[in-house]
Amino acid sequence: MINRVVLFIMDSVGIGALPDADQFGDVGSNTLGNISKVEQGIALPNLTALGLGNIEDIQGVNPVESPKGAYGKSAEVSNGKDTTTGHWELVGLEVTEPFNTYPQGFPADVVENFEKQIGRKMLGNKPASGTVILDELGKEHMQTGHPIVYTSADSVFQIAAHEEVILLGELYKMCEIAREIMRGDHAVARVIARPFVGDPGNFIRTSNRRDYSLDPFGKTLLDIAKEAGKDVIGIGKIEDIFNGNGITEAIHTKDNMDGIDQTIAYLKKENKGIIFTNLVDFDSKYGHRRDPKGYKQALEEMDRRIPEILSHLNDEDLIIFTADHGNDPTFKGSDHTREYIPIVIYGKQVKAGVNIGTRKSFADIAATISDILNIDDTGNGESFKKFILE
């Protein structure tokens, strides 16, 4: 019997363009595959041993004859390629209507309402890379005290502010105001606080980022598990993505290594249910910034710690390594990419070497976890428990 599942999200680690990638401008994207090509290979011996290289052809990540885990990949049903859409589908909510995006910036009524409520003008109001817009408007922001507001191809309203110009408490208050405005007809999936420090030409975003999400529109695996009396521990930005819904305990992290440390800390504790971890650095530090070398190094750094994670699993534990979308750092632009996600499963009770194939929905993961923990499911997805457990 399995009584604890670790759902371990390697944020943006896609494994090849989906068949509908043309509708998203993402034909040819392949986060893992293209990083390994551009960087002449990638060393992920521990994920390789579990079966990662048996899913797809990745330079330096070879298939193994006897994988220690079960493996496969999944397509996405939802209409999107963003954090919220991906994570919601992973826990059983399929998003058929895409969230609003603002390729021309936010409309005048939104701008006026926001500026009136915060008592300041805003800078920017356009789609932009977060680091590029700091180079462009950071100095003016420091001179005027006006927050920098921008969006992307995702459904986001992002507010950047220097921590010495607009204090964190005030920045978070601005985000709460924006969250109330960006509902209904103007609903965005997330309002994001993007604090930074430093001087013009050398700005650095800090780990004090905060996400303000919409409430999920239906019950997720997390809600069902919580109602069934299970522990649901959110590590990283998980609490923010679900606006706290379905979470019994949450811890925010400063980087990938902290995320792994916290996951291990909770594995050592007495809890039963779900440990839901997100490692965001792949996406935020390397994917959007189109830095394949940094992305590769971050993946290798994570892989080196996998034996440590696995050593803390007990006989009733199961871990699923997966992702929420792609963000190919070799691809055009600076946005997410519409890709398959890898699925690698390990546990003392998991059948080694099983290929679960190509799943039709990320929600198959939710259905499987519901099945394993013997709780109700969301009605979406198809469980693959029978293939992976003795």
From Swiss-Prot:
Q: In which pathway does it act?
A: Carbohydrate degradation; 2-deoxy-D-ribose 1-phosphate degradation; D-glyceraldehyde 3-phosphate and acetaldehyde from 2-deoxy-alpha-D-ribose 1-phosphate: step 1/2
In Gene Ontology terms, what is one molecular function of this protein? Answer: magnesium ion binding
Q: Name one GO biological process term.
A: 2-deoxyribose 1-phosphate catabolic process
Query: Where is Mn(2+) 1 annotated to bind?
Result: D11, D324, H325
Task: Tell me which cofactor or cofactors this protein depends on.
Answer: Mn(2+)
Instruction: Give the EC number.
Output: 5.4.2.7
Q: Looking at the Swiss-Prot or TrEMBL record, what is one Pfam family this protein matches?
A: Metalloenzyme
Binding-site residues for Mn(2+) 2, renumbered to this chain: D283, H288, H336
Q: Which UniProt keywords apply?
A: Cytoplasm, Isomerase, Manganese, Metal-binding
**The protein's role, per its UniProt record:** Isomerase that catalyzes the conversion of deoxy-ribose 1-phosphate (dRib-1-P) and ribose 1-phosphate (Rib-1-P) to deoxy-ribose 5-phosphate (dRib-5-P) and ribose 5-phosphate (Rib-5-P), respectively.
Q: Which family does it belong to?
A: Belongs to the phosphopentomutase family.
Record HAMAP family: Phosphopentomut
Q: What is this protein called?
A: Phosphopentomutase
Origin species? Alkaliphilus metalliredigens (strain QYMF)
